[in-house]
């Protein structure tokens, strides 16, 4: 079994910890920004398939998600 020869220094631990926290922070900012754009209706990258049952046909069309409609 591989065993480390020397103890990892505190500064190296802090650097690695801050790198991990930074990656998580950037991922959270990106997710929040994406959620905000979807909720405001300004998203250009999310589409969903909507079945149009009101006309009696089974046609489906591709439309952008609009969360303001009831």
From Swiss-Prot:
The keyword Ribosomal protein applies. Keywords: Chloroplast, Plastid, Ribonucleoprotein, Ribosomal protein. Residues 1-20, 51-70 are annotated as: Disordered. Its main location: plastid. InterPro entries: Ribosomal_bL32, Ribosomal_bL32_plant/cyanobact. One of its GO terms (biological process) is translation. It is found in: Plastid, Chloroplast. GO terms for cellular component: chloroplast; large ribosomal subunit. GO terms for molecular function: structural constituent of ribosome. Residues 52-61 have a biased composition (Polar residues). Belongs to the bacterial ribosomal protein bL32 family. This is Large ribosomal subunit protein bL32c. It comes from Pinus thunbergii (Japanese black pine).
């Amino acid at each position: 079994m591989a065993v480390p020869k020397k103890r990892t220094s505190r500064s190296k631990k802090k650097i690695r910890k801050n790198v991990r926290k930074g990656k998580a922070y950037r991922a959270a900012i990106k997710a929040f920004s994406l959620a905000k754009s979807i909720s405001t209706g300004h998203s250009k990258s999310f589409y969903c398939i909507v079945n149009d049952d009101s006309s009696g046909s089974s046609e489906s069309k591709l439309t952008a998600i609009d969360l303001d409609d009831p």
